[in-house]
Amino acid sequence: MKLIIGVITLFPQMFDALKSGVIGRALKQDRLTLSFWNPRDYATDPHRTVDDRPYGGGPGMVMKFEPLALALKAAKAQLGENTKVIHLTPQGKLLTQAIVREKIHASPLILLAGRYEGIDERLIEAEVDEEWSIGDYILSGGELPAMVLIDAMTRLLPGVLGHKDSASQDSFTAGLLDYSHYTRPEKIADRPVPSVLLSGDHEAISRWRLKQSLGRTWQRRQDLIKRRSLSENEQRLLDEFFEESS
């Protein structure tokens, strides 16, 4: 599987940070291809203007239709006319791990990173297939959300992570938060590693980890528990967690 992503952005240099770590490894392995189109390169006036004042007044500037439309046209000429366009915006649907797993199979994709007060709505109506948000807060532009989506998808590519089970055991993969992790030394001050992790009993370790995942999710993200149908075993483990924590 290869992931092919195009990005429409005024600041392609921001994505240089992706050349390190997991994404850098995927790029070197040719498991991931990133291409960039800067709307400023498609502005037709001498000043290469990409924004203008909003109709109706108000603060800030709005990204213009034409430079974005031409940048998208160039991107689709390379990636394919039917390539889906995803706009990263606080007004979009909340991005989840389930959506990430779905999007990795929709490659190639074009990610549209807005700036300023936003993008002319007519561009969104004409060119955008989906809008996604990484949370209920405001950033300076869509570049960081685009990087978040790229990172989340890249982790799911087979062979990119160091261990074949790393992605399958991440938080949210099973709809739960991750369990606690420990490494050497065995004891730090008065805080020892839970004895079950030293037992060598893999069944007991798996049971403990699931119990911790269930308990942590209940404590921190009850919405995830409530939308999940717990099995009898999971409910029993969650009850044990409550008893042990009381």
Swiss-Prot record:
Example of a GO biological process term: tRNA N1-guanine methylation
EC numbers, comma separated: 2.1.1.228
Entry GO MF terms: tRNA (guanine(37)-N1)-methyltransferase activity
Subcellular localization(s) per the UniProt record: Cytoplasm
Binding site for S-adenosyl-L-methionine: G114, I134, G135, D136, Y137, I138, L139
Any one GO cellular component localisation term in the record: cytosol
InterPro entries the UniProt entry points to: Alpha/beta_knot_MTases, tRNA_m1G_MeTrfase_C_sf, tRNA_m1G_MeTrfase_TrmD, tRNA_m1G_MTases_N, tRNA_MeTrfase_TRMD/TRM10
Annotated keywords: Cytoplasm, Methyltransferase, S-adenosyl-L-methionine, Transferase, tRNA processing
Reactions this protein catalyses: guanosine(37) in tRNA + S-adenosyl-L-methionine = N(1)-methylguanosine(37) in tRNA + S-adenosyl-L-homocysteine + H(+)
Record's subunit section: Homodimer.
Function statement: Specifically methylates guanosine-37 in various tRNAs.
Family note: Belongs to the RNA methyltransferase TrmD family.
UniProt cross-references to NCBIfam families, sorted A to Z: PRK00026.1, trmD
Descriptive protein name: tRNA (guanine-N(1)-)-methyltransferase
UniProt organism field: Coxiella burnetii (strain CbuG_Q212) (Coxiella burnetii (strain Q212))
Gene designation: trmD
